[in-house]
Amino acid sequence: AAGLASQGMLPVVCIYSTFLQRSYDQIIHDVNLLKENVVFAIDRAGFVPADGETHQGIYDPAFLSQVGMPIYSPSNYAELKYWLPILLSNEMQGPRAIRYPRGGESKALAQYGCSGKEYDHLYTAPGAKIVLVSYADEVEDVLNAAKLLGAENIPCDVYKLVKIFPFTEELIREIMR
């Protein structure tokens, strides 16, 4: 992919999250340090119960953020359809990644559609002093947790990220309010 990018092409590397770990050296040296235009389309991102304990897609956000790569992790098809063309366009330069889970779309998350923003404030509880931040299909569990906590008089707000790295100053300031 780095070789194709060095010749002006825009390669898309479609790969399971767990197998992406094995290419970390090439990501650092051949793609990231040279700021090559490569899109990593990361399948099986997040928890993948049916694939066994060695195939959990949980490490790529940590190691891709270490090298400063922008990472997007939509929570539904509408967000994926919106953000993928942007990542494939000339609007973005350098390496970038988009993650998506195994399987279909959650009906609960589908209802949120796509705002076109890098993050959304999904749930506001009066008097909340706790903020839960999540992304991808884990947002559904976090929303449920916020409602359970609310029932115990522990109000929480919930933010859903699409762009999970890097955080913008705007996001940090909003969460701190």
Predicted features along the sequence, with ranges:
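Conserved thiamine diphosphate
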Residues: 2-131, 140, 156
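Generic long, charged, amphipathic alpha-helical segments
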Residues: 124, 136-137, 142-177
